[in-house]
Amino acid sequence: CINSIINQTYINYEIICVDDGSTDNTLKILKNLSINNSRLKAYSINHTGIPSVVKNYGLKLAKGEFLLILDSDDMITEYFLEKGIKYFQDNPVDIILYPIKFMFSNNNYKIIGGIYNNSLNISDVNYLGATNKIISGRDAFRFNIYNKLIGFPFYKKTIDKIINFNEESFNGDEYSFREHLLQAKKIAFIDTEFYVYNFNQESITKKIGVHHWDTWKTWFNLEKLAQKHNYEKKLIKKINKIRYSIYYELCIKFNKTEYLFSQNEKNIILNKILENKNHLSRINSIFDFLFYKCKDEKGKYIKFINKYTFYYKKIKGNNVFFEFKTNK
């Protein structure tokens, strides 16, 4: 990651490295690097396990006019900064989105980015969408919710003076990215350079932990954000539907991974699931009165005339204690 910045053709930058209380030699390595590179500053905080906390700490220290946030496993291509800063200087935009190059362990990769005509299934796509447009932040938010926009952001610093990163859950930065889109007046794309994402199964976001059962808060907050900005009911209903799917997936995840946790951890997770359920409130259209499909802790079901429920796919191995707890 650091080498990809040091090797940039643009050199007027500052590197702020924040170590999230690691127990290896990370901080020592960073401080040694800073001795030989005055543009690199190394800091450490007590371990949180929440990326947004680390990012907000770095934001407070950042002094530059533009802002790029990288994870330690990832990198940027050689002309990333040079082309981005020139575009900022020549055009009145607030965010530039770059394609993402996903690198896998078998040296295979795929490049995705831009605006797509149809909802994007990342596992099936390996091509760029439209990148020759400048769009409003409001449209970018809408495209992203419908899974038609993807890109890695390079910010004008003013965006993050207004909005920091959400710290409610370990994936709070996913909420903040969309909030930043809304804050921007104009958003552009560069498709000749890439953000390189190394798909690491052992990264903090891949490991199963209690924090996974907080991820529902991101979409709960996105629903409130969309309502606050007076988006159409169709979009808000889309978010609401995603929230029910997340609840369902988290219930399945608990059933499959329960054996990994202590009894105390199980109780914490169950309380998080209950909190999630208590914040769910379905948004219906007039057509949903006759019947609609939905999901909950028991499985997938159809609701008829808002009264009768038929489960057509139940969650296998549903723990009796779990079912009792989530329905009391």
Language-model-detected regions and their locations in the chain:
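Short, well-formed alpha-helical segments that are part of the catalytic scaffolds
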Residues: 1-7
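Flexible acidic/His/Gly-enriched loops in nucleotide-sugar-dependent glycosyltransferase catalytic domains
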Residues: 53, 82-159, 163-164
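Membrane-interface aromatic/basic loop that binds lipid-linked glycans or pyrophosphate carriers
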Residues: 254-328
